Amino acid sequence: MAAVFCVYNEEEYLEVAVRAILPAVEQVILCLGLSPYTAYRAEGSLEPYPPDRTEKIVDRLAAEFPGKIQVIKGNWPSQMEHREAGLKRCLELGMDYHFLVDGDEVYREDHLRHIRKTIEQHPETGTFIIKCHTFWRSFHYRIPPEILTWRPRRIFKLTRNRRILGIPFPHKLKFLGANDLNGIGTIYEFPPAEAAFYHFSYARSADRLKEKLATFPHAHQILGGWYERVWRAWPQQREMENIHPTDPPKFPRAVRQSLDDLPPVMKTHPYYGMDIIV
């Protein structure tokens, strides 16, 4: 199994995400974008968002784990094309499973052990859904998986052939969406209590959040005034509901929870002690 990261400007969380998952997989593939996606940039937007320290982090990790970390660098217009580059390398390496991980997704060791065990017990499964805790403006606040409607597909079995009337035919694996591969087999969803990931997508500084909103695939769908009305206003209105930037009910509310369940590696992160990340 290979963990495949497709990243650009992920210096805040990439290193902890990679180190957390390294022991659970045979290979880590880091697909580093050297510039932001152009397909989602708003018309007339010339904001450059130059590279941060992500490339240095990638190079350092690859040097530290030369037999385990593969690096691909390039410029991809869209997230789909970026994903396809990672899939291609995964297939070239002869991997049986593709573990999709974004640069702000961190796993716990006990959850990863359970994931590996479950995969071994379910060879008939082609797609594994792993829900997440999505953090909001702080490590203290999150949209827990129990109220989060998103059901992210994260692990795909790489079946190269499919049988029709008992005859094997080549099956071309490809991404159908940013988080969906056309794998063959059943779908298994992990109960969040058994396995979930910690998604720090909205636990960012104001500048980083603006960059995310300008360059991610749903940039054109962001509701007008959301940044001022929701993001900036939330610290003074922490009971606010329906806070997602493109489809408000997707984030019903951010709930304050204990930090006790966080992956231990997060306890050394610079944001750990902050009530609100600024």
Describe these PLM feature segments.
Residues R19-I72:
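Acidic donor-binding segment of Leloir-type glycosyltransferases
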Residues G74-C90:
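Glycine-rich, basic loop-to-helix element that forms the pyrophosphate-binding segment
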Residues M1-P23, L30:
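N-proximal low-complexity "stem/linker" segments adjacent to membrane-targeting elements
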